[in-house]
Amino acid sequence: MAAVTELPKMNQELAGAVREGLELKKVETTEKNVLPTKEDVAEEKQHVERIHEIEHFDSTKLHSTPVKEKIVLPSADDIKQEKQHLELTDKINNFPSENLKKTETIEKNVLPSPTDVAREKTLQMAASFDKSALHHVETIVSTDVRVTEAQ
């Protein structure tokens, strides 16, 4: 063990205050961990009892009840709509076709003429022309100009 002289020294003022004992101020203590109220305890107890009752419920105590089906009659609006629908379908099915006039159909989407088709084909052929099939040709320019007089 270390000798007393080797231990760290304490401040003289602090050592004197420790020996004399300082007078401490009176302080009011406050609880940081508040205990639950009677209402909280009763509510938790009730909750635990309900859970226990649900877990240990005897389903044999239940009585079966007969199912009563109610027949709902349609409203006046529903009947009116259905009646209108039936009248319309009846009128369509029993429509007198003798009163209709015969008409000739006129073709409004006329097919293009052969010249228009040929013109369109030449444009397509020019756009997709393959130049690799062409052969190289030297051009010969002639400078001989012959003038003939008209008689």
UniProtKB/Swiss-Prot annotation:
- Pfam families, alphabetically? Thymosin
User: What does the UniProt entry report for the null mutant?
Assistant: Lethal at the L3/L4 larval stages or at the young adult stage. Mutants are shorter and stouter, and fail to produce a viable progeny. In oocytes, actin is diffused in the cytoplasm and F-actin accumulation at the cell cortex is reduced resulting in deformed oocytes in the spermatheca and the uterus.
Q: Where does the UniProt annotation locate this protein?
A: Cytoplasm, Cell cortex; Cytoplasm; Cell junction; Cytoplasm, Cytoskeleton
- List the expressing tissues: At the comma stage, enriched in the developing nerve ring (at protein level). Ubiquitously expressed in larvae and adults with enrichment in the spermatheca, the intestinal tract and the posterior bulb of the pharynx (at protein level). Expressed in oocytes and in the gonad (at protein level).
Q: What GO biological process terms are annotated to this protein in UniProt?
A: actin filament organization
Offer a single GO CC term for the protein.
anchoring junction
Q: Which domain of life is it from?
A: Eukaryota
Against InterPro entries, the record matches this protein to:
Beta-thymosin, Beta-thymosin_sf
Q: Name one GO molecular function term.
A: actin monomer binding
Which windows of the sequence hold sequence repeats? 24-29, 62-67, 100-105, 134-139
Q: Where is this region: 4 X 6 AA repeat of L-[KH]-[KSH]-[VT]-[EP]-[TV]?
A: 24-139
What keywords appear on the UniProt entry?
Answer: Actin-binding, Cell junction, Cytoplasm, Cytoskeleton, Repeat
Its family? Belongs to the thymosin beta family.
How this chain assembles, per its entry, is: Interacts (via repeats 1, 2 and 4) with G-actin in a 1:3 ratio. Interacts (via repeats 2 and 3) with F-actin.
Physiological role: Plays an important role in the organization of the cytoskeleton by regulating actin polymerization in two ways. Firstly, by binding to and sequestering actin monomers (G actin) inhibits actin polymerization. Secondly, by binding directly filamentous actin (F actin) promotes actin polymerization. Regulates the formation of cortical actin in oocytes conferring them enough rigidity to sustain the contractions during ovulation.
Quoted from the entry, the domain comment is: The 4 repeats act cooperatively in the binding of G actin.
In Swiss-Prot or TrEMBL terms, this protein is called: Thymosin beta
Tell me the gene name: tth-1
